Amino acid sequence: MLRQLKLTLNISRWIFMPWQRQASASSSQVPPFLAPISDDVIVDYEDPDYLPLPEYPVRPNEPLETRKQRLLYQSRKRGMLENDLLLSTFAAKYLKDFSAEQTAIYDQLINGVSNDWDIYYWATEVKPTPEEYNTEIMKLLKEHVKNAERVTRFRQPDLT
């Protein structure tokens, strides 16, 4: 009982008295569950073998305008804010001018990858892009991410 009380007091001090954290952070008394995490560490796990990933259906008879509308929607609704902002601004700027072949490449890029973090890391050049996705569209996306025009991208562009 005394041990539990002591542990509870130590944890509550760490949570509710942050000024004590810095004083003892230099010592070796930092509990492992409160150890600082470095900002430059990328947590990236391989997809497990037992997790079956669904195949993305190919739509060969889809009209080009319908495909572009679908891709515009999918670029805006990725499930993670970072890609929502990057891909929605990219699609608003370039998708309307893509040819049928470029549109198919963009479709494969955003729907063929099983993990959105991969797209983000490739576009920001944190991780090298695999050869199958290193296309003209990916190069255009990387240039868009560099934001040479210094455009503010705090929100998705309006739909027109």
From Swiss-Prot:
Q: Name one GO biological process term.
A: mitochondrial electron transport, succinate to ubiquinone
Is Chaperone among the key words of this record? Answer: yes
Gene3D superfamilies cross-referenced by the UniProt entry:
Flavinator of succinate dehydrogenase (1.10.150.250)
Instruction: Tell me the protein's name.
Output: Succinate dehydrogenase assembly factor 2-A, mitochondrial
Q: Which UniProt keywords apply?
A: Chaperone, Mitochondrion, Transit peptide
Tell me which family the UniProt entry assigns to this protein: Belongs to the SDHAF2 family.
Could you name the Gene Ontology cellular component terms for this entry?
mitochondrial matrix; mitochondrion
Stretches that traverse the bilayer: none
The record describes its quaternary structure and partners as: Interacts with the flavoprotein subunit within the SDH catalytic dimer.
Q: Where in the cell is it found?
A: Mitochondrion matrix
Q: Where along the chain is the transit peptide annotated?
A: 1-30
Function of the molecule: Plays an essential role in the assembly of succinate dehydrogenase (SDH), an enzyme complex (also referred to as respiratory complex II) that is a component of both the tricarboxylic acid (TCA) cycle and the mitochondrial electron transport chain, and which couples the oxidation of succinate to fumarate with the reduction of ubiquinone (coenzyme Q) to ubiquinol. Required for flavinylation (covalent attachment of FAD) of the flavoprotein subunit of the SDH catalytic dimer.
